[in-house]
């Protein structure tokens, strides 16, 4: 539990009125609201995920908010980045975000960093805050954020979105798992290309995921015990479904700061073997009979398009399946989904069932982008 010194926290009559709906909640009351006022939260990115979190935490009474982003507002942002309006186009995201916060809650202390998070500035910026909310969309930033939070013992609230799906988790919380436990491989070209800018995203989705991140931040500040630590919460907007998956804590540690660089752009250890789509194509063409392709997307996605001769085992049903009739024991099982998230969960579960699993990095999207034809037998 974060230790806030609230003995000298003062509230004006205006603040009592502003937070009156919080003050009557038994789980918050004045003590909880004082904790919110003393809390310091940093947003990595002021885009789709950051927008709802920034405005809701400012409204909730978080006393100090930091925002780091070097981007300029563009017309294409307005479909999902709800902080901004047409007349904001061309201006700095962090400057406009600061103005919107102060328009809503003048008591909030807002600090903006018009830059990218980097190895050179991450320690100095992140050490000033209690909770770090990740709204980034690239692996370099996520790994740097992971390692800095680990070094400084800061709480890291992760969020990610892709097309119609989102993920949320809390990392480095009271000795719990960190981001590298969930996604230990370094950035690869196939996965890195699949972001909102080139693969698309439902405009409503970052609002849902970003608000869930903000909710976890409030719960942590208030000292609630039920936190998304050790668990990934996934949301599928097409099926209106939520799922939770456990994360194994590998006790990943960085021995010293000077060792950080070896983790950026280099391969770190992983519990799940992987293969690129190019390597997979070569294997399939070799006509090795001892394999099976497993597609863990839902039935609707599978019927729209899939790799020829693949078996559909939807992730949401995979835990309750009996695999004896499929004869997977003596085969190499290549697991894929649209991109990466579901295949990671499925692979870890199937490995626990003593199956020979190899995950396909980048999934069906990478195959379409790099190989093209889904009928690899041609």
Swiss-Prot record:
Family in the record: Belongs to the HesA/MoeB/ThiF family.
EC class name: transferase
Membrane-spanning parts: none
GO cellular component: chloroplast; cytosol
Binding, ATP: 48, 69, 76-80, 93, 137-138
PANTHER family, alphabetized: ADENYLYLTRANSFERASE AND SULFURTRANSFERASE MOCS3, UBIQUITIN-ACTIVATING ENZYME E1
Signal peptide, first to last residue: none
Gene Ontology biological-process entries: Mo-molybdopterin cofactor biosynthetic process
Alphabetically ordered keywords of this record: ATP-binding, Chloroplast, Molybdenum cofactor biosynthesis, Nucleotide-binding, Nucleotidyltransferase, Plastid, Transferase
E.C. no: 2.7.7.80
PROSITE patterns (alphabetical): RHODANESE_3
Transferase as UniProt keyword: yes
Role: Catalyzes the adenylation by ATP of the carboxyl group of the C-terminal glycine of sulfur carrier protein moaD.
Name recorded for this polypeptide: Probable molybdopterin-synthase adenylyltransferase
Pathway it works in: Cofactor biosynthesis; molybdopterin biosynthesis
Pfam families found in the cross-reference section: Rhodanese, ThiF
Annotated localization: Plastid, Chloroplast
An example molecular function term from Gene Ontology annotations: ATP binding
Recorded catalytic activity of this chain's protein: [molybdopterin-synthase sulfur-carrier protein]-C-terminal Gly-Gly + ATP + H(+) = [molybdopterin-synthase sulfur-carrier protein]-C-terminal Gly-Gly-AMP + diphosphate
